[in-house]
Amino acid sequence: MTVLYIDADACPVKDEVYKVAARYGLKTFVVSNSWIRVPLTPAIEQIVVDAGPDIADDWIAERAGPGDVVITNDIPLADRVLKAGGAALGTTGRLFTVDTIGSALASRMIGEHLRSMGEITSGPKAFGPADRSKFLQALDTAVVKARRVVR
């Protein structure tokens, strides 16, 4: 059965994920390093991990596998999920694939290098209604595809 995992710290589309999870009856883990409000339903479980780099990512990566969908903007986590056979979807609806993850990792490393040299890089653009709509469509598509995966 498909499971959804939300890398929930700073995730702007949690409510959208809850709606899709309810529509398909999917177990959903909301993973963060602090308490956040989640719907009171047995299908949605909040996991609070210790604060620290990559602890939430590790929790998700150790569990996600074929047929699961992970919602994250963390490119290294997306890479780990793909290597485990799962699907990784960014909050803007960007589906990470084995064909695109390498360039995403490279772009991330270049940005980190530029920032370490004192270069000012632009952050992400403001998140708006069109982004939410694109995300919902992409999540629905990812869930339909993931449900076809044989575990």
Swiss-Prot record:
Pfam families: DUF188. It comes from the Bacteria. InterPro entries: UPF0178. Signal peptide: none annotated. Belongs to the UPF0178 family. PANTHER family: UPF0178 PROTEIN YAII. This is UPF0178 protein Caul_3070. It comes from Caulobacter sp. (strain K31). The lineage of its organism: Bacteria, Pseudomonadati, Pseudomonadota, Alphaproteobacteria, Caulobacterales.
